[in-house]
Amino acid sequence: FVDYYRILEQLAKADSCTAQLLQVHTHASGIVAWHATPEQRAKFLPEVVEGGKLIASAGSEADPKSKVVEVGRSELRRAAGGYRLTCFKHFASLAAAADYYLIWTAIPGAAPLSERQLFVLVPRDGDGVELVDEWDTLGMRSTVSWGIKITDHFVPAERVIGAPGCWVRDPRTFTLAYVANHLGAAEGAFEAALDFVRGRAYLAQSEAIKVTIGDLASRLYANQCALYAAAAQWEVAAGQGWDRPVLDRAEMMSLQALHMAKRCSLDVSERVFDICGARATFKSMPLEQIYRDIRTFTLHFRDDLYMVRVAEGLLDPETFEAKGKYKRMDRPAVAVAGA
């Protein structure tokens, strides 16, 4: 966990989008590695490790043009030898470059959605698969997070990954990867501002600018401590066989770290402009892209919903679950994924 987040943090210093695409691919590959059968792992993982194939995870059904809250509607239809799939996924980072799409969907039935949810692997060139270029955004542009429209695509049984409800039983979460990305991007902005100031004596000698630099450096350090304290707790949870209290503590720490990383990265990426002045707004400087990327990516999931989970876990610890976010899918009236 710790090494993985250090890699994402360092990549995000250079480019938040690149770090996000690696995150998407590794998370999708990790889901296949964890939930696939031995036969599926033997088939698909060598294609990734040895063949360099990419997998994009596609779960969001938050239509950018919709006026209603996102509701998971993707559901398989039984067919001879497998299933039929029709769905429209949005915000699918890596979609344009991926060889496979790991589609979050569900088997038909009356049980809550989280108990029916599983994954299917859909090849990019499969029948009924269409990419929709709807990615015209403020930032995170190079993630090329196009829509994936799938119409009556046949999914053979060997491409169904996991058992129904497998994800809410999987102890892992994605939370800290976003923390690492936000933190790394903010560190990239801060280091660019430091380089700018070092080259200009009139700025480097300003007491006001020194105060701001010291303040931002301290905020970044605090966020880094929060990230790696939570990552260490995940190491403990894995080492103790995913004991529920230890696991839940890891996710609680991760949610708090994510909240602080969102706030800190937004603050840092804005205040570096005050340090550097109007020249920092030119596209020859990296700060404007970093700011746009941070402003966009920190909206990935509604922070207020995360903080509700933290508060509820503090007020009634027995109700907190590491995978509680995904059980919100069972309550359609609740906003489950503000993208």
Question: What is each PLM-predicted segment?
Answer:
Residues 276-339:
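Glycine-rich phosphate/cofactor-binding loops in nucleotide/flavin-utilizing enzymes
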Residues 184, 214-221, 255, 259-266, ...:
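Generic structural signal for well-ordered, non-transmembrane alpha-helical segments
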Residues 90-95, 174-178, 297-300:
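Glycine-rich phosphate/pyrophosphate-binding beta-alpha loops
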Residues 222-260, 273-281:
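C-terminal helix-coil-helix/basic helical segment that borders enzyme active sites and/or dimer interfaces
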Residues 1-93:
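Glycine-rich flavin
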Residues 7, 28, 85-87, 120, ...:
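Buried hydrophobic positions in well-ordered alpha/beta secondary-structure cores of metabolic enzymes
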Residues 135-221:
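Glycine-rich beta->alpha junctions and the first turn(s) of the following alpha-helix
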Residues 88-130:
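A short core secondary-structure module
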